[in-house]
From Swiss-Prot:
Keyword Phosphoprotein: yes
Protein's gene: Ripor3
Domain of life where this protein originates: Eukaryota
Residues with Phosphothreonine modification: T345
Protein name (database record): RIPOR family member 3
Record organism: Mus musculus (Mouse)
InterPro entries the record matches: ARM-like, ARM-type_fold, FAM65_N, RIPOR3
Modified residues (Phosphoserine): S9, S24, S340, S351, S384
Length: 938
């Protein structure tokens, strides 16, 4: 479907602004609207005149710098930008090859003017290619500098965590303050590089191509389209004419892309004195960096009944204006953002490291300490003595601090000062001095006093991370995962754990839950509270206590200094000297030995092994809940149940985060940790038989299964032989699966069950006597087998003889019951439907049945889908009307018929939903037949 457009001139702009009554709801246009359309048609000649597109640059203003860098977003934009620049370069190269071929075939004497024009065009393309290549090199340089600051920030964060976990002293507090300032400088540099990168993103030229809506667009309708990209806005109004053409007051606008903002589009229908929002969508700008023009068709409504057509052209080289990025005073001048882009060089290392390396060179001869040993070089020792070294070093450090700036007013001054700073400092990877002397001092002297606290004690360990070990392309920044630094030994409650056989840390489940929460609906307060709880839990995680082997002072210092060795990657060997001092070690020399530790640096702990197990189990439950919440076509009822369970899991995590570690490791019963557990006497007695002192809050599923069979053996085996194993497994599946809300893939023997899961099941089922509950569960399991395997006559007697509303019911019961409505004689099917309708009078039974059958609508088995539709029809499950309607377009006739009958049985609401789906299906078929519309869905 082609859309005819007319764009008004400046004199006609007020015509569209006159708002009449919407024809979509009040018929076609009135006399006033017809007069308006005629006046627009008379001025259509002027409307076709090309007008200079207005740019949105005037909306950019200088603002405050947001110290919140987003490395993953920058990486995403950088990859898209590089891909687009390469495509643009390939197209220009292809054009250059074509022009070179024509230039070679053309004789210089023939058509001299044509030859000169071709030669001029050839030189123009060559110049443009050089600009693009230089542009790509500057983008690479910017991102390389950004990665350096990224790694420096991680290193500073890890060192800050190391000092915060060490013994508190005056020196450590001073080091923390200095590290905080260094970390702040890294954050500022990252944000400034992000702002500079925005100057290399080019511009987007957006052209309005009109609305596509078929039945939704009527003559006389007026719409307002608002596009927003950061602080840039484009608001334009349009009108649907009687000849199906569209008139808009503006044709195109230029947007400047940003790193952190996406393109937001909102369409509003103007109705006289009021307006109605048709829909709003968000488009990722990373998809727009393409060399060729794109025809973008965006679904404004959820069902795609109204679409917005845009033509988008990306210009990678924008030289008409200069942008102003938000920056603090003294970093960038107002007009120097684009002017200083191509003279920018990576910033020097923060002054904290400059002063530290200078102090290594200017230290006097090694002095003896109280014990007669040499004074080891350390960060803490340097920070504690930095105020006592005299004005000379203080003035030199002040000069370095002044030189350590990201940019200055003059770009050339910036380059000079930065290069001078680099050559003076040198960024030595190891301390300059005699290696033999250092080894002799380390071998003969006693343990140094100036090292990081905890090295003199064998029960504590320090692990300093090398930046090269971190994966910069990961999904998240591993501020904690890659740097376990100093944690006291944790008492182990199990023999296997005492031997060093520990499980994985809880960092992985925590991050998985946080990733799912960040992609979830932000309007859900339950999920936001859960996110805050998990974030607080992550902050409390500590590196697992390790037993390090004895390490030498020189080995540790070399490992610390090697963390910043990547800064010397591009320096020549003669540039590594400093003030005429001795040279640094050669590159081909072997690296210093890393301190030997026995634990993987990625293992984080909550302080006790049992707490780690509990947190892992409940975080996995949260992960399963969030994954189910993110599934499409989810009913409101199921969503409410999932959110309610998420609230309970948040409460469990809150209780776990407040537990006393010593009390947990020494407790002999659950009551000592959770006094409220005494209210469940029957369940508590069973649980205590499954646990041991020091591990009373969790037990393996196999242990709980054995205890259940041992406790209720006399009750089940005599009356229901062969059912004990099945009954106990069904009970455990309900405990692990949150009462049927989550369907477990099968009970694994190595699976862990927590007291909180067991207590939640007892509370959900209102169980006061566990023995009676198990007897009732045994009857239900027996009923399942009889309904599935018995003949029609026996199954019919069972249906009439049981009080079905008193069942739990189990998922297996509901499935067997639903299938009875399809298979077997008509009399049995009618009886199954009648009994299901009567059992629905019980509120608890109906809720569980609705929950199960609504989930069964998404089953891969078509027969289960058909049975679920029939069951929901008997239950009057109008809450699941939208999910049932979606099956009306199934490929199988039986499923379509069952879904149609169930939908129409819901009365007026079901009829409207069915008509809406049928109309949508017809529109989609008509839309697929149109071959001249290109659609890009975001």
């Amino acid at each position: 479907m082609s859309v005819r457009l007319r764009f008004l001139s400046q004199g006609d702009a007020g015509a569209v602004g006159t708002v009449g009554r919407s024809a979509s709801f009040a018929g076609f246009s009135s006399a006033q609207s017809r007069r308006l359309s005629k006046s627009i048609n008379r001025n259509s000649v002027r409307s076709r005149l090309p007008a200079k597109s207005s740019k949105a640059y005037r909306t950019l203003r200088k603002g405050s710098l947001c110290l919140d860098p987003r490395p993953q977003q920058v990486k995403k934009i950088f990859d898209a930008l590089k891909r687009g620049l390469r495509e643009h370069l390939c197209e220009q190269q292809a054009e250059l090859d074509y022009l070179c071929g024509r230039h070679t075939d053309t004789q210089r004497g023939s058509r001299l003017a044509f030859y000169y024009d071709l030669d001029k065009q050839l030189r123009l393309v060559e110049r443009h290619i050089r600009k693009v290549e230089f542009h790509i090199s500057k983008v690479d340089e910017l991102y390389e500098a950004y990665c350096i600051q990224w790694r420096l920030r991680d290193g500073a964060s890890n060192m800050q965590r190391a000092f915060s976990n060490s013994t508190q002293s005056r020196a450590s507090r001073e080091s923390l303050q200095e590290l905080g300032r260094s970390l702040q400088e890294c954050l500022e540099d990252m944000c400034l590089i992000e702002g500079t990168l925005e100057g290399h993103l080019g511009e987007f030229q957006v052209k309005m191509k009109g609305l596509v809506g078929y039945a939704r667009l009527c003559p006389g309708d007026q719409y307002e389209v608002l596009m927003r990209l950061g602080r840039q806005r484009w608001r334009l109004k349009g009108r649907i004419e009687p000849d199906d053409s569209q008139t808009w007051d503006e044709e195109e606008r230029v947007f400047v892309p940003t790193v952190h903002e996406n393109l937001e589009i909102k369409v509003t229908e103007l109705r006289g004195l009021s307006s109605m929002v048709v829909g709003a969508v968000t488009c990722d700008v990373a998809d727009f960096f393409m060399a060729r023009p794109q025809l973008v068709v965006v679904d404004i409504t959820e069902l795609g009944t109204i679409k917005l057509q845009l033509e988008l052209l990306w210009n990678p080289l924008d030289s008409e204006c200069r942008l102003v990025s938000p920056s603090p005073t003294g970093r960038f001048s107002m007009g120097s953002r684009k002017g200083s882009l191509y003279t920018w060089t990576p910033p020097s290392t923060p002054s904290f490291r400059d002063k530290y390396y200078l102090s290594l060179l200017q230290q006097p001869v090694q002095q003896s300490l109280l014990l007669g040993g040499p004074k080891a070089t350390s960060i803490l020792g340097y920070l504690s003595d930095s105020e006592l070294q005299g004005p000379r070093l203080r003035s030199r450090s002040q000069e370095l601090l002044e030189m350590d700036s990201f940019s200055s007013e003059d770009p050339r001054d910036t380059e000079t000062s930065t290069s001078a700073s680099t050559s003076d400092v040198g960024f030595l990877p190891v301390p300059v001095g005699s290696a033999a002397c250092t080894e002799e001092e380390t071998r003969e002297g006693p343990p140094p006093l100036g090292l990081l606290p905890g090295l003199a004690h064998p029960a504590r360990g320090v692990l300093v991370e090398r930046p090269g070990w971190r994966d910069l392309g990961g999904e998240r920044l591993a501020l904690l995962q890659d740097a376990p630094i100093h944690s006291p030994m944790v008492p182990r409650s199990r023999k296997g754990q005492e031997d060093g056989d520990v499980g994985d840390g809880v960092e992985g489940p925590v991050q998985e839950v946080l990733d799912l929460l960040r992609s979830a609906d932000p309007a859900q307060p339950q999920l936001r509270e859960l996110e805050y709880q998990v974030l607080g839990l992550r902050e409390r995680l500590k590196p697992r206590g390790v037993q390090p082997e004895p390490v030498s002072a020189q080995s540790l210092m070399d490992c610390i200094l090697e963390s910043f060795a990547f800064l010397n990657a591009d320096l020549a060997s003669d540039e590594l000297s400093l003030f005429g001092g001795s040279q640094a070690p050669e590159r081909d020399s072997p690296p210093p030995p890393r301190p030997s530790l026995k634990v993987s640096p990625s293992e984080l702990t909550a302080g006790a092994p049992e707490l780690d197990t509990l947190l892992t189990v409940h975080l996995q439950v949260c992960k399963a809940l969030l994954q189910k919440l993110a599934s499409p076509n989810l009913s409101r009822m199921v969503e409410d149940c999932l959110l309610e369970e998420a609230v309970q899991q948040r409460q469990v995590l809150e209780v776990l985060s407040d537990l006393d570690l010593e009390q947990v490791s020494k407790a002999r019963s659950v009551e000592e940790i959770i006094p409220q557990a005494s209210h469940r006497k029957g369940g508590l007695a069973l649980w205590q038989g499954c646990t041991q002192p020091g591990g009373v809050l969790a037990c393996p599923a196999s242990t709980l299964l054995s205890q259940l069979k041992k406790t209720f053996l006399h009750r089940v085996r005599g009356k229901y032989p062969g059912q004990l194993e099945i009954v106990c497994r069904r009970l455990l599946e309900q405990v692990v699966g949150c009462g049927g809300l989550l369907v477990p893939a099968g009970l694994q023997e190595e699976q862990v069950v927590t007291w909180f899961q067991f207590h939640s099941y007892l509370q959900r089922q209102s169980i006061s006597d566990l023995e009676k509950h198990l007897a009732q569960l045994t009857k239900e399991v027996t009923l399942i087998e009889e309904l599935s395997c018995a003949g029609p006559a026996k199954a019919l007697r069972k249906l009439h003889g049981k009080c079905l509303s008193q069942l739990q019911p189990l998922p297996q019961t509901l499935q067997a019951w639903a299938l009875l409505q399809l298979d077997g004689p008509p009399r049995l099917c009618r009886a199954a439907r009648t009994r299901l309708a009567s059992a629905a009078r019980n509120k608890r039974f109906r809720e569980k049945a609705l929950l199960y059958y609504t989930n069964a609508l998404n089953d891969s088995d078509a027969k289960v889908q058909q049975a679920a539709c029939v069951a929901l029809q008997q239950l009057g499950g109008i809450e699941s009307c939208e999910q049932i309607v979606s099956l009306c377009q199934s490929d199988l006739e039986a499923v379509r018929v069952a879904a149609r009958e169930a939908t129409l049985s819901f009365g007026e609401k079901g009829r409207l939903a069915f008509e809406k789906m049928d109309k949508l299906h017809s529109e989609q078929e008509a839309f697929c037949q149109e071959a001249d519309v290109e659609i890009t869905i975001f």
